[in-house]
């Protein structure tokens, strides 16, 4: 299961982006924020009271004329409803209750999703009375905040995470491996999934996914039990407005959050695009296992060196994730399709791999003997021992004399030693350095 998703919904100019930017400004323990994955920053990984979650800003749609406000608000709220675990419904305490607020409230009530009503722009104590009229929305007790002054944000987040507690017992079968298929329109995601389901003939069920235009297929194979998530929301018949594409990307992010393994599908004829890099970059940033599949390989004129050359070019474009596995297939002809789930399972096995502490320390001791840590300033790094503290991805803590002595090049050397000895292909690994006083 992925982290809970919290969407901020509201009509234009109520302060959605201001609130999001305040939350993403590391004032509430943001643990990871990845700018540049999309032109506008639309998500941030956050933590409050030990609950980790993904904040999504559904702002950025500012209608040019009044007659399109209602239709754009409906679209914005509907997509948030589909994908979010909890919705922050933001209203303007200075301007007061507006017809557009009432329309959104009606949609949210029908959704049965948890909603936290938040009255923004309550900058002074005397403005608190402005919140009372919002009881008329029928959404519950409002929380008053001032996003510009960072007032009341703690109370708001307390209300949000209360809903996570109610959700803790819910969940999908933990033994199932969730695989998200991502990529440009018409790259062959649905064709590949249909091929996999048709050949395995062991479909347990097809159920509607958590996002519109997305179907989750359950399939049991000799390699394990899988949930195949088709991010068909990116499929478009014609070029659409920027805000629609924005929401297609959000839906893809939601699917990535749920996944254990992300399969990036690339068209062998068109090659990799900037959008491909950004989307798979998000999967990399939040530490998912990754498999890159080049589809339509049957259409490429090739010799015995073509595949290696193509893979080298891909590795240059995806240099930020050198650990990724690669597979060249044709969903149409079935070429190497049988290897897709097998390879995805290999990625997952490495993603969840645990290494015994004794073996781990033997390898690191050998690595230190082969290459001594450099001197940083006047001090040389001493590594006392290392232990693995988690998986998804494999995470290792090195106990050292001074974490400031670790040079990035030596950290990379240690990570490479772990990879060479324990095979972490298909998954990133994390290394942390903590001080341990010498006895």
UniProtKB/Swiss-Prot annotation:
GTP 1 binds at residues 10-17, 57-61, 120-123. Pfam families: KH_dom-like (PF14714), MMR_HSR1 (PF01926). Residues 353-437 form the KH-like domain. Residues 4-168, 177-352 form the EngA-type G domain. GTP 2 binds at residues 183-190, 230-234, 295-298. InterPro entries: AAA+_ATPase (IPR003593), G_ENGA (IPR031166), GTP-bd (IPR006073), GTPase_Der (IPR016484), KH_dom-like (IPR032859), KH_dom-like_a/b (IPR015946), P-loop_NTPase (IPR027417), Small_GTP-bd (IPR005225). One of its GO terms (biological process) is ribosome biogenesis. Keywords: GTP-binding, Nucleotide-binding, Repeat, Ribosome biogenesis. The keyword Repeat applies. Gene3D superfamilies: 3.30.300.20, P-loop containing nucleotide triphosphate hydrolases. One of its GO terms (molecular function) is ribosome binding. Associates with the 50S ribosomal subunit. GTPase that plays an essential role in the late steps of ribosome biogenesis. HAMAP family: GTPase_Der. Belongs to the TRAFAC class TrmE-Era-EngA-EngB-Septin-like GTPase superfamily. EngA (Der) GTPase family. This is GTPase Der. It comes from Clostridium botulinum (strain Loch Maree / Type A3). The gene is der.
């Amino acid at each position: 299961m992925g982290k809970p998703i919290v969407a901020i919904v509201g009509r234009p100019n109520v302060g959605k982006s201001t609130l999001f930017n305040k939350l993403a400004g590391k004032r509430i323990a943001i643990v990871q924020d990845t700018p540049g994955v999309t032109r506008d920053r639309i998500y941030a990984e956050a933590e409050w009271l030990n609950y980790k979650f993904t904040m999504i800003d559904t702002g950025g749609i500012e209608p040019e004329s009044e007659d399109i406000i209602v239709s754009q608000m409906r679209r914005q709220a509907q997509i948030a409803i589909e994908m979010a675990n909890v919705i922050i419904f933001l209203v303007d305490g200075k301007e007061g209750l507006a017809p557009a607020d009432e329309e959104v409230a009606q949609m949210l009530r029908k959704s049965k999703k948890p909603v936290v009503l938040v009255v923004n722009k309550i900058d002074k104590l005397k403005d608190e009375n402005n919140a009372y009229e919002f009881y008329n929305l029928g959404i519950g007790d409002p929380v008053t905040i001032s996003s510009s002054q960072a007032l009341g944000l703690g109370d708001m987040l307390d209300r949000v995470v209360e809903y996570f507690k109610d959700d803790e017992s819910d969940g999908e079968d933990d033994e199932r491996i969730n695989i998200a298929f991502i990529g440009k329109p018409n790259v062959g995601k649905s064709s590949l999934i249909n091929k996999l389901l048709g050949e395995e003939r062991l479909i347990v069920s097809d159920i509607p996914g958590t996002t519109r235009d997305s179907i989750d297929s359950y399939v049991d194979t000799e390699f394990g039990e899988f949930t195949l998530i088709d991010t068909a929301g990116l499929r478009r018949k014609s070029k659409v407005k920027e805000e629609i594409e924005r929401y297609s990307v959000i839906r893809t992010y939601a699917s990535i959050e749920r996944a254990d393994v992300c399969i990036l599908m690339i068209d062998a004829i068109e090659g990799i695009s900037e959008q491909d890099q950004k989307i798979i970059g998000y999967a990399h940033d939040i530490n998912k296992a990754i498999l890159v599949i080049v589809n339509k390989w049957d259409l490429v004129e090739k010799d015995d060196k073509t595949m290696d050359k193509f893979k080298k070019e891909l590795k240059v474009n995806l240099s930020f994730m050198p650990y990724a596995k690669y597979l060249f297939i044709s969903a149409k002809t079935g070429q190497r399709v049988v290897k897709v789930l097998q390879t995805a399972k290999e990625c997952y096995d490495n993603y969840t791999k645990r290494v015994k502490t004794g073996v781990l320390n033997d390898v690191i001791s050998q690595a230190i003997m082969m290459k001594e840590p450099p001197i940083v300033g006047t001090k040389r790094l001493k590594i006392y021992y290392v232990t693995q503290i988690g998986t998804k991805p494999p995470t290792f803590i090195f106990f050292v004399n001074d974490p400031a002595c670790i040079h990035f090049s030596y950290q990379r050397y240690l990570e490479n030693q772990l990879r060479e000895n324990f095979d972490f292909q298909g998954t990133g690994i994390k290394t942390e350095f903590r001080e341990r006083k010498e006895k």
